[in-house]
């Protein structure tokens, strides 16, 4: 494992250093006592065999009971502090990953699929939490137990301890073979989890389409195949790992037979002078401790190898540097809603061959209403995404309020810009809670006023609980038109300097669309309004209309000017006026 990855996770211990260190101390104390218990047990056995004084036997017995109680207490405390440390560690990792994702630009997000990020935040972090718990408990306990037990076995058993020269290499070799065989399957599982989660996410998001095309059986089979792939890999890995137990039992029984057979002969031939019954008893216990510690080490190896893949995946997110950052001395106030594009060209990645936008020169005065029309794939949305700096331009500059957007504090800039998308998102909670994303301190009267302007107040009041009605995740219990109007109301509550509507009235009828635009003129006259639309009726009263074609502005002007100068605009207008506009709410 690379030191950089380890360093990334060590930082996440933070305020849980104390329980982590206490866990290590308790484990060391527990192991030390556990290793001493067989030593005193040997004395007790010999004393009983020799018919020693009862008081002395009771004294040794009480010492053993006290040691067992202290060992139990240390083990319990180690479990408590270890659980606290590992849970806190996992919480910090989860929080750090989530915080990092929140800072990502779209370019960063594009490197990871949504399903992959969900897997890293859940399954991968759970694996790392388990690994952390094993490291601070078993990974300390097993090596200490192994070393201390071998030392005590040679002190107590002498020649008998040579059994470990045979047993340990056999067990180690077997455990290494088992781990080497199981690891590829465990690694494959995590990659397949991403694909499984992608399938689940896609199915849930597109449930209406799935049911509309009666594709439930196909989706079940698709999910079943992905699930079976994971099952097969896990089954193979678990079958291999299951060989741990029989291998362990074989070594334990071999050790017992060797110690009892050779030890008994030594007692008989030496008359108990070379070795005694108590020593044989302790040798059996030390042998068990040595072999158990080796099995624990093998379990740690398997678990850490599994977790290593998870750690790498989490570290990829934590070490991913956000492409968009604040400058050293950011501007923290937006003067007005004016927007300037100066020789702007843009492509989504440095390696891309084609520019999504090219040669954009545009001035939008503060408070103006600008309409943008164009066919699918003409980069209308890309153009407006440069204003709140969701992406950085490849060439040229974008200015808001006369200042390059790259010079602003990101939060300040984005707080001054409200964007309403065609497929905007509502979050699980009440309507009030969703609306207050625009202004968390908005009064009930302000909520109602914004909703009246967005033509949402009537349908909200028709719900049994009104503004306290619950919105399901993603807004699945409201229609497309209702969702768009709620999102527009949310944006109005923000009272932004720039309002961007990205085809966000596509699901409402033309009358409602006109009423919403009339509300903009009365409620936010000083706000710059940029409206992307497919319907000419949605933008014909704008101060300026842009016609986009192939990532360029092919024409601009008022409605009347474009009817005269732009063939594309005139053609769209004639098609819509002749065919009629039949969009319904």
What is the meaning of each model-derived region?
Residues 1-34, 41, 47-64, 78-82, ...:
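Membrane-integrated ABC transporters
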Residues 2, 25-26, 33-46, 67-114, ...:
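Juxtamembrane helix-loop junctions of ABC transporter transmembrane domains
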Residues 15, 19-32, 43, 133-189, ...:
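Transmembrane helices of ABC transporter permease
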Residues 15-17, 103-107, 123-132, 136, ...:
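An intracellular "coupling" helix at the cytosolic face of ABC transporter transmembrane type-1 domains
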Residues 19-20, 67-86, 137-144, 165-191, ...:
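Alpha-helical transmembrane segments of multi-pass membrane proteins
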Residues 50-51, 87, 95-119, 123-125, ...:
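Short intracellular "coupling" helices and adjacent cytoplasmic loop segments at the cytosolic face
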Residues 52-56, 148, 152-166, 236-313, ...:
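Helix-loop-helix
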Residues 333-585:
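ABC-type nucleotide-binding domain
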